[in-house]
Design a protein with these regions (language model features):
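Compositionally biased regions
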Residues: 15-17, 21, 41
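Short hydrophobic/aromatic beta-strand or adjacent loop that forms the aromatic wall/cage
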Residues: 124-126
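Bacterial N-terminal signal peptides that target proteins for export
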Residues: 1-7
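Bacterial N-terminal signal peptides
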Residues: 7-16
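N-terminal helix-cap/turn-to-beta initiation motif at the start of protein domains
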Residues: 20-34
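Short beta-strand-to-coil "C-cap" segments at the C-terminal boundary of structured domains/repeats
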Residues: 128-134
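Contiguous, well-ordered beta-strand patches that form the walls/edges
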Residues: 34-52, 58-118
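Short, solvent-exposed loop/turn segments at conserved positions within beta-propeller repeat blades
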Residues: 120-122
Length: 134
């Protein structure tokens, strides 16, 4: 289960944002974020993992728990905004950025979540992240 969380979170990486609103979100995402809540398939992460889960946005890249950067696109014309992760395993998601709080919910194989929650057998992962003040 821990490996599943790490692998799924590792896919949330690198930003290419269209349009002016997207450019503003790109700037707002910069920095380090720490998970304060997470679920995958309706279940919480293994003990101790949540406290270690960090995401760092730098320029057009993002790394999860120190992993290699991965690219994704953000489309702010949708509500909630869409995130598409561009790697070998297609992931699509939604996100909401409000100040120092970032909600992310992603699914695999083109199954975009419709809400910021997960249920058993959905292959969706949800995270609530808070900005780390450095």
């Amino acid at each position: 289960m821990e490996r599943r969380f790490i692998l799924l979170f590792a896919f949330l990486l690198s930003v290419s944002l269209p349009g002016n609103a997207g450019a503003q979100n790109k700037v707002a995402l910069q920095g380090k974020w720490r998970a304060v809540e997470a679920t995958s398939n309706g279940e919480p992460p293994p003990a101790g993992l949540l406290e270690k889960l960090t995401i760092v946005f730098v320029g057009e890249t993002v790394s999860v728990m120190g992993s290699s950067p991965t690219r994704f696109t953000i489309d702010t014309s949708f509500r909630p905004a869409h995130i598409d992760i561009l790697n070998s395993r297609r992931q699509v998601g939604i996100y909401e950025l409000k100040g120092d709080a970032l909600k992310l919910c992603v699914g695999t194989d083109g199954d975009r979540p419709k809400a910021f929650r997960t249920e058993k057998y959905t292959d969706h992962t949800y995270m609530l992240l808070k900005r780390v003040k450095e």
